[in-house]
């Protein structure tokens, strides 16, 4: 119980700090999965916490001509991936973009993304008032086969098949 209360107080303090500095969202633990030669797509993952209700409505990156918000969902006992127009970011709640769930797809990669590199991302957020803002993020590139915690991934090949992803 004390851990929950402590975590809640930290979240409230962080949101108050955001509001005081005019920021509307923070991004934590942003990372991109490294690619293998000839692979033309990969995933980007992170935690986004908005100070007020917002939506993630777009992503841009100089590393990829095409960047989209995607969702993985179990449908008829098959994992399916599809692009989504937006992702709701409730006020004060961390929304995790992770392998096997919501994530950013970086597609048509002109060159491999190597572990240890950094990939710049620009997130486009929209408030309830229709106002848009961008957040610049530097995502670290992690080796193929890792998850957000740097542990070996059980689903490491999941994004490897996106190399032939077509739109």
Model-derived segments and spans:
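Absolute protein N-terminus
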Residues: 1, 21-24
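Bacterial N-terminal signal peptides that target proteins for export
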Residues: 1-9
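Compositionally biased, intrinsically disordered low-complexity segments
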Residues: 7, 13-15, 138
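N-terminal signal peptide c-region/cleavage motif recognized by signal peptidases
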Residues: 14-22
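Compact, glycine-rich, soluble single-domain proteins
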Residues: 24-167
């Amino acid at each position: 119980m004390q851990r929950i209360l402590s975590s809640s107080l930290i979240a409230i303090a962080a949101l108050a700090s955001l509001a005081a500095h005019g920021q509307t969202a923070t991004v934590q633990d942003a990372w991109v999965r490294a690619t293998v030669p000839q692979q033309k797509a990969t995933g980007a993952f992170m935690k986004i916490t908005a100070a007020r209700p917002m939506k993630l409505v777009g992503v841009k990156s100089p590393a990829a001509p095409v960047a989209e918000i995607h969702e993985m969902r179990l449908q008829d006992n098959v994992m399916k991936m599809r692009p989504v127009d937006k992702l709701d970011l409730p006020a004060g709640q961390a929304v995790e973009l992770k392998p096997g769930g919501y994530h950013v797809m970086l597609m048509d990669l002109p060159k491999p993304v190597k572990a240890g590199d950094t990939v710049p991302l620009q997130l486009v957020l929209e408030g309830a008032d229709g106002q848009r803002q961008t957040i610049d993020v530097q995502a670290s590139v992690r080796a193929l086969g890792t998850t957000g915690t740097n542990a070996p991934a059980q689903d490491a090949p999941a994004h490897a098949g996106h190399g032939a992803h077509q739109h």
